[in-house]
């Protein structure tokens, strides 16, 4: 795969990606295609596919969830696999030229013409999707969904972080033409897929269905894998760090960075509520500390006896 990045009109970056001799484009500040990041198998893919087959003519898809659970990644992965072409507009990084297009969406013919020209991507009626990534950062784009869906030429996927997407609706008319689905961190089975374990989940299902005991050796092995999942967690970035580095300390640092982002989001919403929002995290840390302290005391007492 060949990759090349070019500047067009000053601040607009177009990443040119050559795959098997074919030219692919993306832009708006998203550079994931130039990073060779892994894309994990997610169960929500089937929900998105159901929307495409049965609802996309009348509704845009809104994928909502906490930050860093993989919303943007799964949206783009789905667009690559299920559509002839796609445009991804990342409102966290996109250019002013793209933002200005939403000042006038009454003439949609001209709107789409300009969008294709600026992005360097051709759209095909009924076969292309436009992704509004981090749509909570630009509510005007979300409001435009009503008219874009009614136009019927293309499909639309929006992604938004839970906290901000609920807050940033004060000055807009929330479109009813949205089919909402929630995305969460990776569950145990998705974690197994990510680490290349295609056996354990089926084994557990078989044991439960047939009400059979696992046996000591199998039980120990399954519990070892489950404890690993509990240590790494379900955030894709943390799992990626574990797979690449095999270092739990680095995994913890990655998770700490994610929690820091959450804290920053809480402050943006309402600084005085930060303590309330963070209380569950603090309680977890207190309970974990007490549990570890009690275990150490009990073991010390047993040794003295």
Which sequence ranges carry the predicted segments?
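Structural recognition of the conserved hydrophobic beta-strand(s) that form the central parallel beta-sheet
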Residues: 155-161, 182, 191
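Short glycine-rich substrate-engagement loop in P-loop NTPases that contacts/grips substrate
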Residues: 93-126
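Hydrophobic positions on the alpha1 helix immediately C-terminal to the Walker A/P-loop
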Residues: 74, 78
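Conserved lysine of the Walker
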Residues: 71
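Interdomain hinge/linker elements that couple catalytic modules in large macromolecular machines
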Residues: 16, 20-32, 196-305
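Short regulatory helix/loop adjacent to the ATP-binding pocket of P-loop NTPases
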Residues: 147, 164-180, 192-197
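Pre-Walker A adenine-sensing motif
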Residues: 39-55
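Hydrophobic anchor at the beta1->P-loop junction of P-loop NTPases
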Residues: 63
């Amino acid at each position: 795969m060949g990759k090349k990045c070019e500047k067009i009109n000053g601040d607009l970056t177009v990443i040119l990606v050559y795959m098997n001799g074919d030219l692919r484009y993306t832009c708006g500040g998203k550079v994931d295609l130039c990073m060779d990041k892994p894309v994990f198998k997610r169960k929500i893919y089937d929900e998105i596919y159901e929307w495409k087959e049965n609802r996309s003519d009348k509704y845009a898809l809104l994928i909502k969830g906490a930050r860093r659970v993989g919303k943007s990644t799964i949206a783009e992965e789905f667009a690559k696999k299920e559509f002839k072409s796609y445009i991804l507009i990342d409102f966290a990084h996109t250019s002013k030229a793209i933002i200005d297009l939403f000042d006038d969406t009454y003439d949609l013919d001209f709107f789409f013409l300009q969008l294709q020209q600026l992005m360097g991507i051709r759209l095909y009626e009924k076969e292309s999707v436009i992704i509004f990534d981090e749509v909570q950062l630009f509510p005007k784009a979300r409001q435009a969904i009503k008219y874009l869906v009614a136009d019927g030429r293309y499909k639309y996927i929006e992604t938004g972080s839970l906290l901000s997407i609920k807050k940033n609706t004060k000055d807009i008319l929330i479109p009813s033409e949205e089919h909402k689905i929630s995305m969460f961190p990776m569950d145990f089975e998705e974690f197994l897929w990510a680490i290349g374990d295609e056996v354990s989940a089926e084994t557990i299902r078989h044991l439960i269905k047939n009400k059979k005991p696992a046996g000591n050796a199998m039980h120990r092995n399954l519990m070892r894998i489950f404890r690993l999942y509990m240590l790494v967690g379900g955030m894709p970035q943390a799992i990626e760090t574990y797979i690449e580095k095999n270092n739990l300390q680095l995994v913890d640092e990655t998770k700490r960075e994610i929690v820091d982002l959450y804290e920053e989001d809480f402050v943006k919403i309402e600084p005085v509520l930060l303590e309330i929002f963070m209380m569950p995290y603090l309680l977890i840390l207190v309970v974990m500390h007490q549990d570890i302290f009690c275990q150490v005391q009990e073991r010390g007492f047993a040794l003295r006896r």
